[in-house]
Structure formats: structure tokens, C-alpha cells
């Protein structure tokens, strides 16, 4: 069943206290166990759900807050930990940890996360998507490539694919948020990505904030060594799924 409207509304997640508490959970990824935090809305469900994918800092307080706010908006939000408990204190440390994560393991963890969400009684298995920032935005796209049942992928300034064979694997609808001044993701590549998906008949909604660099949002405040202010050029998207 097609969902309408797919991207009915883009809202700002208010920067305030956590709205919902995360419940520590774990799930199997191959022979390994992945820890995560599950944030649930009030009520019994059946809820749409999102895999919440952290950026290169790790699963820090900022990411937890976004998952909490998503739960406040009606989503079951699973904030996963691709770093196995590590949280970076400096950019150099973040890069080092990120480079040490095997890509195949991360993608396996993500596929296991969607399977875990679909197994929950209070989650609608047909409305499971993903959202990520920076590194996590790229992995959100990877999950759309690897999981044919994924309903939506939100990419906040993450790496993009250009290979036609790869893009053809995407069944999910795609929402992308990018900065026009982001040197790592040129605007031309974003527009090409959008055009390719549209030519394939996919539903894609791209927003480029011309004066914004990367990132577009408030940063982590979990560690004093990480900058505590960043320009707030654009919204963090929330996707409202309504069945036709």
C-alpha cells in the first residue's frame, strides 16, 4: 500500500529536555550482540519505526535526544550503537573509531536492527525506516540499498551513491537534507542523485540549504571538548506516514 503523503511535513525537533526515556535493548547481528536504546511513544501502537543512526562521534547524548524527540512525535526510535560502546571526545578520535568499523559489520548491524523493530508487537512492520546524520546519513542510504522492505530513508548530509545498479536496489522513499556549502558533498552530486532516483520512478524529496555547510544542526553536548554551538541552518526532518 502506498503511503500518502510520504513526506507530509518537515518539522524542527526542539532543543529541549528529553521527551522519552530510552530503554536499553540488545539484538543479534550474526554471532555478535548489538546494544541499542529503544524510545517508544506513549500508547500501545502499532507505531511507525525508525532506526536512528549516529554520526561519527558515536551514540552520544545529541543522538539520544533526537531519538527521544522522534518518539515524542509518534515513532518507535531505535538508536543503535555501531561503535560497540565507544563515544569519541575529539574529531581525531571520531575519525579513528569510524575508520575502525568494518563496513560489512555495520551494514549487518543495520539489517538486524530493522529485523528487530519488525519483530516488536507494538511496531508496524510495514512502516520501518531509517534516519542518520553525516556518517549515519550514508548508512541510512546503505540500509535502503540493502533492505528491500525499508519504507523510507532520511539522509542528513550523508554520502550518496551514483551507480545506477546500486540505486535500482532502493525501494524506499528518500528524504535528503544537504548544505549548499558542504565541501564533502557537492550540490551537483546531490542534484544528480535526485535526478537518477526520479528517472527510476522513485519518490525522492531533496532539500538543499544554500548557505549551510556541514553539519546543519546543533552538535553533541555530551563532551566539553566537542564544540557546543553550530549554525542551525535547517530543520531535522520528521516523516509523517499516512496510509491511503
Predicted regions and their residues:
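Acidic catalytic loop of the alpha/beta-hydrolase fold
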Residues: 181-185
Amino acid at each position: 500500500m502506498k503511503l500518502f503523503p510520504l513526506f507530509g511535513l518537515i518539522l524542527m525537533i526542539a532543543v529541549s529536555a528529553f521527551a522519552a526515556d530510552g530503554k536499553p535493548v540488545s539484538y543479534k547481528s550474526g554471532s555478535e550482540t548489538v546494544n541499542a536504546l529503544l524510545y517508544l511513544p506513549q500508547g500501545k501502537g502499532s507505531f511507525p519505526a525508525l532506526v536512528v543512526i549516529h554520526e561519527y562521534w558515536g551514540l552520544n547524548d545529541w543522538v539520544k535526544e533526537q531519538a527521544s524527540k522522534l518518539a515524542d512525535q509518534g515513532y518507535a526510535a531505535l538508536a543503535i550503537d555501531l561503535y560497540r560502546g565507544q563515544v569519541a571526545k575529539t574529531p581525531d578520535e571520531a575519525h579513528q573509531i569510524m575508520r575502525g568499523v568494518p563496513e560489512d559489520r555495520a551494514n549487518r548491524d543495520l539489517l538486524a536492527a530493522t529485523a528487530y523493530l519488525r519483530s516488536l508487537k507494538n511496531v508496524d512492520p510495514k512502516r520501518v525506516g531509517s534516519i542518520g546524520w553525516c556518517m549515519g546519513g550514508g548508512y541510512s542510504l546503505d540500509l535502503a540499498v540493502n533492505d528491500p522492505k525499508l519504507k523510507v530513508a532520511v539522509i542528513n548530509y550523508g554520502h550518496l551513491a551514483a551507480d545506477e545498479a546500486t540505486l535500482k536496489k532502493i525501494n524506499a522513499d528518500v528524504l535528503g537534507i544537504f548544505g549548499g556549502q558542504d565541501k564533502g558533498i557537492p550540490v551537483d552530486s546531490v542534484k544528480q542523485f535526485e535526478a537518477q532516483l526520479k528517472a527510476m520512478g522513485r519518490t525522492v524529496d531533496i532539500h538543499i540549504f544554500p548557505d549551510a555547510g556541514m553539519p546543519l544542526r546543533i552538535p553533541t553536548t555530551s563532551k566539553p571538548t566537542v564544540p557546543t554551538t553550530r549554525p542551525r541552518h535547517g530543520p531535522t526532518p520528521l516523516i509523517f506516514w499516512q496510509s491511503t
